[in-house]
């Protein structure tokens, strides 16, 4: 939380809104591989290495959360070709192989299209101010606002549930309404929320 606010306070808004938000580049291992289980092996072993189905499932869950932040934080989401298709690979040259035409992860591609549409539908996400509302214990909530639009981004990377204020949920993953109307984020859940009460307190406890 403090790191985000330090960036927001030390860069002009015009600059912050144009920074390139990368998860992967041609000079780094594929983000899906980074988010999988650690592997130390020879260059030949890394060339042949692919995640097990269980490892890949975990890495994909982490990537969905990371991409959600990539599209909701200030800056321009920049996607390295193939990351949206689920490509794996260690450092150069393994991160630069051909795009997997006809073998893409279509579910992941659809998710990236949905994130792009979500950002495109919200001026607050594209150009809004950033304010960190709560951070700690594996949880973070921040708002993006401009003009009359204000949205709250919440990510739960803790081991327990996180109860959030009631409101309109514009996007959610691993979330459910409570009997009293609040939004409950499960472990690994995240959402884009418009709280019914703009002054509602968000606790990380």
Feature annotation, model-predicted:
Residues 167-176:
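Solvent-exposed beta-hairpin/edge-strand motifs
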């Amino acid at each position: 939380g403090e790191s985000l606010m330090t960036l927001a306070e030390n860069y002009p808004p015009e600059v912050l809104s144009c920074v390139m938000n990368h998860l992967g580049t041609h000079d780094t291992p594929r983000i899906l591989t980074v988010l999988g289980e650690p592997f130390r092996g020879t260059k030949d072993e890394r060339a042949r290495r692919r995640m097990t189905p269980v490892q890949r499932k975990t890495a994909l869950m982490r990537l969905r959360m990371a991409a959600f932040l990539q599209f909701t934080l200030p800056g321009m989401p920049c996607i390295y070709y193939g990351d949206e298709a689920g490509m794996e690979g260690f450092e150069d040259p393994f991160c630069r192989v051909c795009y997997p035409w006809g073998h893409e992860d279509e579910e992941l591609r659809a998710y990236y299209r949905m994130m792009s549409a979500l950002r495109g539908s919200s001026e607050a996400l594209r150009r809004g101010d950033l304010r960190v509302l709560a951070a700690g214990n594996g949880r973070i909530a921040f708002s993006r606002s401009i003009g009359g639009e204000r949205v709250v981004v919440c990510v739960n990377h803790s081991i327990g549930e996180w109860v959030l204020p009631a409101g309109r949920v514009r996007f959610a993953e691993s979330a459910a309404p409570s009997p009293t109307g609040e939004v409950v984020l499960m472990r690994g859940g995240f959402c884009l929320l418009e709280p019914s009460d703009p002054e509602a307190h968000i606790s990380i406890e």
